[in-house]
Amino acid sequence: MSEPEANIHTTAGKLADLQRRIEEATHAGSARAVEKQHAKGKLTARERIDLLLDEGSFVELDEFARHRSTNFGIEKNRPYGDGVVTGYGTVDGRPVCVYSQDFTIFGGSLGEVYGEKIVKVMDFALKNGCPVVGINDGGGARIQEGVVALGLFAEIFRRNVHASGVVPQISLIVGPCAGGAVYSPAITDFTVMVDQTSHMFITGPDVIKTVTGEDVGFEELGGARTHNTTSGVAHHMAGDEKDAIDYVKGLLSYLPSNNLSEPPAFPEEADLETSDVDRELDALIPDSANQPYDMHVAIEHVLDDHEFLETQALFAPNILTGFGRVEGHSVGIVANQPMQFAGCLDIKASEKAARFVRTCDAYNIPVITFVDVPGFLPGTDQEYDGIIRRGAKLIFAYAEATVPLITVITRKAFGGAYDVMGSKHLGADLNLAWPTAQIAVMGAQGAVNILHRRTLAAIEDPAAQDERRQELIQEYEDTLLNPYVAAERGYVDAVIMPSETRRHIVRGLRTLRNKREALPPKKHGNIPL
């Protein structure tokens, strides 16, 4: 026999009615829909929130909100929550706002009330100065609600823009994210995707097939691997949803709650005595200037516990970006990677590094730059695709940054790429060079071919010509291809033993912790987008 319905005209009845409604809101998606979600290896909206937030900290907002649409019979199905779970809680004890799209209700599609819930929690985060994590798993705009859905998308975009650089915004893509829905993650600071589960695209495979005749699958078009390796839309490719959420929590641990506060710190005074581990850096640079080495080694030797949280690891691997700590304080790392394209800068690397430097600057995180760059990658593709304009973004990012900037030149720093990579001339506070540094307009081979073209051309015997060329190369290297010409002019503040790098960075950051620098008043700069 079913239980008698509670009398809602009594206090006990009203309380029982509330409990019933809460239960209904918590399980708004059908059991079958939840089962299908789990069968795909995906979690539900609430399970994701539970994994992200500290246990028992989640406070839900608008759980009883329901859509008001009457088109196409949708009025007969008005589940609580309307397909998105919103609220706030804590991650490692720090306040965070969150919204999680529920694919088990209307396929996670965005309608008016759904959008209003997201807008409300974003406004709440902005007023209270706490990060926003958006968990995306939805089918785009709710067709039944027409232009109203599009209007709410734009309301969300506007808030993404207003919150940019004020509170950290992280997008977690754990399912489909198509059409207009992709632009919100695109504006946020970091986007995390799950391999084989996440898909992002403006137009899907069917539309592309109809319009262009191209055959392309979901994974190839907009999968996690595509956006992590080719487009640069995403910052991390996770193996599963738990890995993705752990990465998000890792990011939050390095970021402040807002632009007016400092990043979380776990102060621990560094031992400034040079250790055997530090001395490993003295043997890092090969004798041959053309032999690569792994810049990760230099980075990890400088950071606490050798811990480096890399961002966009699979995109533009010729430059490394990510977070670490020095004496328990957050730092951002930008570094050329000689293992890829010899560390050359290209369009993708320039834009990747520029965006990262600007993110660090927005959130009060010092930037440490490791330089080993032979120049910009040559080629017609680079020129035609706009390396001049797009490479200039990196200049803009360093020159406008007011956070502490420390640069370490480990080997090559040639031509315009020397200027671009956090040089003293762009406003870096502390510029260090290893004895292996080669700071010059170009490498010895190219310089000799230009400077001594006539001299070499006058030597008819090929063997004698090669011998003379080697002599001239040696002369150029001895004269200019070193850190001391730059040191004489104050372009580098010190030439140091590689093993002393961490000590110099620790002392530099201690001094720069109270740095204050103001740029000329302006509405905003005009970065070459």
Question: What do the PLM-derived regions correspond to, one by one?
Answer:
Residues 1-529:
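Ligand-binding clefts of soluble mixed alpha/beta catalytic domains
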